[in-house]
Every structure is written in C-alpha cells, then in structure tokens.
C-alpha cells in the first residue's frame, strides 16, 4: 500500500468533463434516482425506437433478471459508424499499427462503413441470419473489427476467441454456442512469429460438425488448406457484394455478443451481453473515465479477444466518434521502446495497458522509455489486475514524466465496463487503489457470512444493484449464472474479488478471493505480499500462493523473477524475507522463495495461479489445461526447481 496521494492537477480541474463537484452530484443522482439518471444517459446513443422503460432488474436468487431500456430498439453498428458520417466521414476511425513497425493503415469512418457493410453482405450470402452465432478467431487486424461490427449490423451474435487459444479451446467455444460460421485468417503475426490460425481452425473443426462456413482473411499470404464448399477467401467474396447494407433493428435486450471467460470450476462460461445497456455503458465509461474529448487519439493495447478489446478498442470509442488504435504486435518487439515509439508516431493522447506489460517493460530500465518523447500523452490507464504501487509509480514518473494522471480501472468480463476507477479531473489518486465507484455502481464489502462491513475494512466485494453494462446470463446455462454470482450473498452480485476500503473511502482490490492466504488465522491478500516483493529494487515480478503448512495452516510460497542481470543467491533470498517483514510485518514473511526465470501466463498476460498453487503443494500430477499458456516450458522449470519437494 502506498500512502502517497496525487491530487488532481490544476489544468485537469479546468478542462475535464467531470470535476470533483460534478462527480459528487452525478454519483448521488445515479444512486438516489437511477431511473432519471439513466433515462438521460441512455440518450448518448441513437435509438431507432426510443425507450420508455429504463430499469427492470432483480438480484433475487430465485428470480435473477436484468433488463435495461427493454422497449427501445437500436443497432450497435449504426451507433459506431453511421451516426458519425454526417460530421466526421473523413475522420480516422481506426489506426492500425502492424507487428512490423513499418506497416500501418488508417481507416476513416466512411471507409469503415463500406468495409463493415461489405463484410455484413458476405455473411448474409453465406447464410448467416439474425440471432445466429458467429465465432471470430482472428489476429489484431482491421478485419477483426469489421467482422464484429458486421455481425452487429445484421443481428448475428459474435463470439470472439483470442487468437492465442489452442484448437481444443476454440472447438469447445464453437460447440458451446453452436456457431455455424467461423471467421479466421490464414495466419496471425505477433512479435515476428507466425500463428497458424487457419490450421488451428481446421483442427478444431474436426470436433465441430455444426460449422457450415469458414470465411478466411488473407493476411500473411501463407499457404493454407481450403475445404471446398465450406471455406471461402474473404476478398473473393467481398468483391461480389455491395458496400451498402441496411442495419437490422435490434431490441435493447437482444444479444450483441458472447465472450468466454474462465471460471474457478468447470468449462469456460459464455458471458452474454445484450445491445442497449451495453452500448450506453461502454460509451459512457469511455468518455468519462478517459475524459475523452473530440480529436483525442486513444490507444488501448488489449486484444479484441478479451472484453477490454470489445468495450475499449471497439464499441466504446467508436460509439463516441473517437480515433482508436489497434496494435497487432507486442510491447517488446522489435525492442522495449515499441510502445513509446508508437505513441510518438501516432501522437497518442490516452494510453490504456496492463500491469503485466508495465512490469515487463520496467525490467528493461528507463532508457528505452526516455529515448522517446511521449509529449502527446495526457492520460494513462491500467487494466486487467491490481497494479502494484511500484509499477504505478514507475508508470507515472517514467512513462508519464510525472504529468499524466493514471486511471487504475477495476472491472470484469461480466461487468461489460469499468465499475471502480478514478475520474481524472475529479478524484485524487493513490498508487495501487482503484479509488471510487463509477456512476450507478454501489460497491459493498461483506464478510464471509455476508454481513455488510462499514467504514475502513477488508472483505469480499459485492455490488448492490444493477448497471446497464452487466452481463445478462451465462449462455445456455442461466442456473450457472445464478449459482456463480448471486447465491453466496443473496440479493447481491458477488464479484469473486477481495477488497479493502480505506479511511478515505478508497477501494483497493486485493485479488481473487481464492487468492487469499490464511496464515496462522490472519487473512492476507496475495497482491499485498506481491507488491512488497516487487518493491524490492532487484525484483521484476512476483507471484504468491499458499501451501499446506504443519504449524500455520497455510504457508507463503513466493515465486520471484529478478531484474535482468541480477543473480539468484541464498543471501538475496534471506534479504527478501527480511524486506517483506519490514514492508508488511512478520506474519507476511515468505516461508519459501523460488527464483523463476518466468511465470506461467496466459497470452493475455494473466498469471495462472492455479498452476503455481499445485507446484507449491508439490502436486503436479494434474496441472490441468496448460494450452492457454504463452510459454508452457516455464512450467517444467518451475516443477524442477520447486522448493517444497516431499521427503
């Protein structure tokens, strides 16, 4: 935890859309009179048939039902494209930056309209109808955005599967939502390496007899097999169709997309988002959290295969008529200056990335950052996991030169958009804290029995009432939706995250509740111990898990990756134990420290703690599915060098 407070800079108070007084006024209105508040905010998007009903929601476990703006009709692609054509047809909608730094493209709103209509007509020609599910398994290229918006235009439900997932994972997601059509590319490119997307698709489709059509975008030109009658080249089909396509009129509660997310148990859940409430919330959070002004160049580094890419590369920014940057590559290719070079090249004003990426770049030192200008930057954002204060301070001081506020955003695939975050012109920030709730969001902290905890406290984070961006169900399994989120603390949405609220009412996400350690009866979030370790000057990254301990119940097992060039010695191991004792207290002292050259991460950068827990428990006979790991070989090293070997 950092005690430092960073006040809102004076110039931000003047120019921000929301200042401190406006935040207080709007937040109170959103809680005290949600009907009136959301009636007004719903008008930020265009409706074909205006809504008269605002909110019809129940968190009662016997009748969980979430509906917003339910009698209104609209089309998401119209809100992202057509409504901007009168004023900004020639404005750049998407800047595409290729994996190769010499390749980029700029797509205007007029061009986006034509490309999306063409793609929509190709889908229709292949038999895709309103309500059909379409699986998109694509690299980060403009055609991925065209495909998503084309589905929205004709009322098909897209299910985007991250291009790093294995054929098995892809097959499971295709089967679960009964997709009849898959959109893919010949190959993807990341960090100079090719990813065989079409070959993976072919492998997956051996288990998916329901797929009748595969549309293939030619990206690298690599040789791929094409199955006659099923597979078509997108460019050939696009040449046959018109660049106009009338949008389908959709009910606010018609599905827009399904996105699969891992649960703590069982197969991935198909998180279902609908059209009206999601679009209102994505647009609104993008504008207020990032203080988006007309003309800003906005870059979110996520992949469209994750919810962050859906809400904050595509739907939110485009609904607001923004210029959004899509990046095919990785932060350290060809070298560790890549992100900062892209910011200079495209004069990016708002930059939104993940702590994992920042910690990796921190390891490389300041020089790769300092040799770039970054003078266009105005605002920095963090997403995906709690950001440790050390990384926050580096981000602020080194990347932002001490002049850019940081919005540390907390939300989930399930929430559709940001729930807790500073608004940069309204809320002073504390390194490591997501600070305050967004409009309409009522966080509560409860203990294990469900009792609401007041004031400064620690416990389980729940949300007390619905918001428009909330998921509506688990696709095809409403009972799982109810059991996962509404049974444990009846009448509340349970986030699965632990949280601390400080004496100023600021919220600090402490990690998943299943990442909580109980050491000698003391509760401790793994994020807290990790932050202490990473604060040591020789440590680049740390992950902490519990393991069975004869005396304490649970011991603390720390996996530590050192800064490049530092040696893993017994002296350093002892020094780190002393360091953590000093930072948090004796109760937090790691019992075992394993130096690790790398940690098992998914391709989106999340650490697979399940694997780390198994290794720490000396139980690696069943490590589960490791196909989603970016580098499965790190697991072998971790097992070989584990510190808790039996006997």
Curated annotation (Swiss-Prot):
InterPro entries membership: Ac_CoA_lig, ACAS_N, AMP-bd_C, AMP-bd_C_sf, AMP-binding_CS, AMP-dep_synth/lig_dom, ANL_N_sf
The name this protein goes by in its record: Acetyl-coenzyme A synthetase
Record-listed E.C. numbers: 6.2.1.1
Cofactor: Mg(2+)
Catalyzed reactions per annotation: acetate + ATP + CoA = acetyl-CoA + AMP + diphosphate
Chain's role: Catalyzes the conversion of acetate into acetyl-CoA (AcCoA), an essential intermediate at the junction of anabolic and catabolic pathways. AcsA undergoes a two-step reaction. In the first half reaction, AcsA combines acetate with ATP to form acetyl-adenylate (AcAMP) intermediate. In the second half reaction, it can then transfer the acetyl group from AcAMP to the sulfhydryl group of CoA, forming the product AcCoA.
GO (cellular component) term, any one: cytosol
NCBIfam families per record: Ac_CoA_lig_AcsA, PRK00174.1
Molecular functions (GO terms): acetate-CoA ligase activity; AMP binding; ATP binding; metal ion binding
Protein's organism: Parvibaculum lavamentivorans (strain DS-1 / DSM 13023 / NCIMB 13966)
Modified how: Acetylated. Deacetylation by the SIR2-homolog deacetylase activates the enzyme.
PROSITE patterns: AMP_BINDING
UniProt: ATP binding residues: 384-386, 408-413, 497, 512, 523
Superkingdom as given in the UniProt entry: Bacteria
Keyword Lyase: no
Binding site for Mg(2+): 534, 536, 539
Binding-site positions, CoA: 190-193, 308, 332, 520, 581
Keywords noted in UniProt: Acetylation, ATP-binding, Ligase, Magnesium, Metal-binding, Nucleotide-binding
Entry's Gene Ontology BP terms: acetyl-CoA biosynthetic process from acetate
